[in-house]
Design a protein with these regions (language model features):
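Conserved acidic E/D residue at the C-terminus of a beta-strand in Rossmann-like folds
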Residues: 30-31
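Conserved small/polar residues in nucleotide/adenosyl-binding loops
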Residues: 102-109
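Short alpha-helix immediately C-terminal to the canonical SAM-binding loop
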Residues: 36
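Aromatic pocket-lining residues of Rossmann-like dinucleotide-binding sites
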Residues: 19
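Glycine-rich Rossmann-fold phosphate-binding loop(s) that bind the pyrophosphate
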Residues: 8
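N-terminal Rossmann-fold NAD(P) dinucleotide-binding loop
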Residues: 12
Length: 113
């Protein structure tokens, strides 16, 4: 299974460590070149420098041949946009975008309708 992890912070690094240990083919996207270099050496994975919410970056990461993308940046809005853009490029893609702001969670919006 090919997985893209977008964001190499605490959550993304933990996911990358666990998923590579389980034998998954991981590509890591982040906007910080130094963090990516460290992860590339530590985990021996493909990395892509750029904004995970952009079409060009996702295509460089191989989104069209990917089974799952996990958007794990520190910004909920970026995570959601990343998954929406990625799904537009690969309709068979599974997406995960953790959302920490309660006002962005779908089940919370019912009280506003």
């Amino acid at each position: 299974m090919k997985i893209i992890v977008a964001g190499d912070g605490k959550v993304g690094a933990t996911l990358t460590r666990q998923l590579t240990a389980e034998g998954y083919d991981i590509t890591l996207i982040d906007s910080n070149k130094d963090v990516l270099s460290s992860s590339m050496e530590q985990f021996d994975i493909m990395t892509v420098h750029g904004n995970c919410a952009t079409k060009d970056t996702l295509l460089k990461a191989g989104i069209t041949d990917t089974d799952l993308i996990i958007a794990a940046t520190s910004a909920d809005e970026v995570n959601l946009l990343c998954c929406i853009t990625a799904h537009g490029l690969n309709k068979n893609l599974h997406t995960i975008a953790p959302v920490s702001y309660t006002h962005l969670r779908a089940h919370e919006t019912d009280s506003y309708l």
